[in-house]
Swiss-Prot record:
Its cofactor is Mg(2+); Mn(2+). Catalyzes the NADPH-dependent rearrangement and reduction of 1-deoxy-D-xylulose-5-phosphate (DXP) to 2-C-methyl-D-erythritol 4-phosphate (MEP). It catalyses: 2-C-methyl-D-erythritol 4-phosphate + NADP(+) = 1-deoxy-D-xylulose 5-phosphate + NADPH + H(+). Pathway: Isoprenoid biosynthesis; isopentenyl diphosphate biosynthesis via DXP pathway; isopentenyl diphosphate from 1-deoxy-D-xylulose 5-phosphate: step 1/6. Its EC number is 1.1.1.267. Mn(2+) binds at D151, E153, E224. This is 1-deoxy-D-xylulose 5-phosphate reductoisomerase. The gene is dxr. It holds the Pfam family DXP_redisom_C. One of its GO terms (biological process) is isopentenyl diphosphate biosynthetic process, methylerythritol 4-phosphate pathway involved in terpenoid biosynthetic process. Gene3D superfamilies: 1.10.1740.10, NAD(P)-binding Rossmann-like Domain. It comes from Burkholderia multivorans (strain ATCC 17616 / 249). 1-deoxy-D-xylulose 5-phosphate binds at K126, S152, E153, S179, H202, S215, N220, K221, E224.
Length: 398
């Protein structure tokens, strides 16, 4: 039976890759809803190609622009806007599958709505679990939702895990691989001069600017450790991080009998997306087959926590529990935005996050509202810290 998709964040890199796979298999997948924030022109192009019933944008002005262009082209797609519209298309009876690809905390509410509606959720929005892991996973279990990870590392682990949950006791640990980003071998003393464009030049993956910066700081890998903790139910001390510059082995599962299972493939997000879309079947993703003879060599190294303090901060937040992970994520989003706008330097990202975690008392969250309150407080503190640190501002341009 054809799957009906709501694609949250259709104009981003995950959205592009998802629609590429969808277009290859029109007999398997159709689109119920596409959503974007303010990239209205790209959303219009997608709507004209995939003919969703609904399109959602962030504000009224963008909605008016999108609707005018769609009507002029003869499209009947309904255009909505605002956070509630995102929630509505995520829980609508018009879809059975929700691809959660909105970057950042903005993706939490619609992803949670999809879980509470019992949808099949392809999760690329790691912040949903970083901010409110217990709440989100409880919703998945309580409402019979199906959670399929789309992040390449978590999808790799999922593929290497036994299908029977009763066999999970045989797992010793899981190992998330990381490329090390663009600054893996750069002298740490020179990182203070890094520009946004340099930080966004990932050596292997094509990604959006925010996640590219997170990869450069390795905050992304720290968030993925937290995400893996919630998805796979393992404590932090059984989740390792391993630098693997070639990005061919996407993650590994180590078993108690000494076996290690790994998932390999070219670094292309269409592979995990196609796996999750068609699961438990396999379909063509348009990805070139891996040629190990051409690659010839795979290398590995332990992460340097002095070079990547954001990774250490994320692991600390996971160990502390409570609202620490939500605060970590919120402070990082504010700091990365400031860096991309050249208001702070690269190394100030970690410094800002650490200062917020030190200033905000940790506590056990009392429901989703408490998590959102912690998120708001961490954002306020991060903004204050950035505003009071003019010496860190970056004047250099590319």
């Amino acid at each position: 039976m054809q799957k009906r998709l709501t694609l949250l964040g259709s104009t981003g890199s995950i959205g592009d890759s998802t629609l590429d796979v969808v277009a290859r298999h029109p007999e398997r997948f159709s689109v119920y809803a596409l959503t974007a924030h303010r990239n209205g022109d790209k959303l219009v192009e997608q709507c004209l190609r995939f003919a969703p019933e609904v399109a959602v944008v962030g504000d009224a002005a963008t909605a008016a622009h999108v609707e005018a262009r769609l009507r002029a082209a003869g499209s009947r797609t309904t255009v909505l806007y605002g956070p509630q519209a995102l929630v509505d298309v995520s829980k609508s009876d018009g879809c059975d599958t929700v691809v959660a690809a909105i970057v950042g905390a903005a993706g939490l509410a619609p992803s949670l709505a999809a879980a509470r509606a019992g949808k099949r959720i392809l999760l690329a929005n790691k912040e949903s679990l970083v901010m409110s892991g217990a709440i989100f996973m409880d919703a998945v279990r309580d409402h019979g939702a199906i959670l399929l990870p789309v992040d390449s590392e978590h999808n790799a682990i999922f593929q290497c895990m036994p299908r029977d949950a009763a066999e999970h006791g045989g797992i010793a640990k899981i190992i998330l691989t990381a490329s090390g980003g663009p600054f893996r071998t750069r002298e740490p003393a020179t990182l203070v001069d890094v520009t946004p464009d340099e930080a966004c030049k990932h050596p292997n993956w094509v990604m959006g600017r925010k996640i590219s910066v997170d990869s450069a700081t390795m905050m992304n890998k720290g968030l993925e450790v937290i995400e893996a903790h919630w998805i796979f139910g393992l404590p932090g001390d059984r989740i390792d991080v391993l630098i693997h510059p070639q990005s061919v082995i996407h993650s590994l599962v180590s078993y108690r009998d000494g076996s290690v299972l790994a998932q390999l493939g070219n670094p292309d997000m269409r592979t995990p997306i196609a796996h999750a879309l068609a699961f438990p079947e396999r379909v063509d993703a348009g990805v070139e087959q891996l040629d190990l003879a051409q690659i010839a060599q795979l290398s590995f190294e332990k992460p340097d926590y002095a070079r990547f303090p954001c990774l250490a901060l994320a692991l600390k937040a996971l160990a502390e529990g409570g609202i620490a992970s939500a605060a970590l994520n919120a402070a990082n989003e504010v700091a990365v935005e400031a860096f991309l706008e050249r208001r702070i330097g690269f190394m100030a990202i970690a410094a800002t996050v650490e200062a917020v975690l030190d200033a905000l008392p940790n506590r056990a969250p009392d429901g989703l509202d408490d998590v959102l309150a912690a998120d708001a407080e961490a954002r306020r503190l991060a903004a204050e810290i950035i505003a009071k640190a003019p010496a860190r501002r970056v004047e250099r341009t590319v």
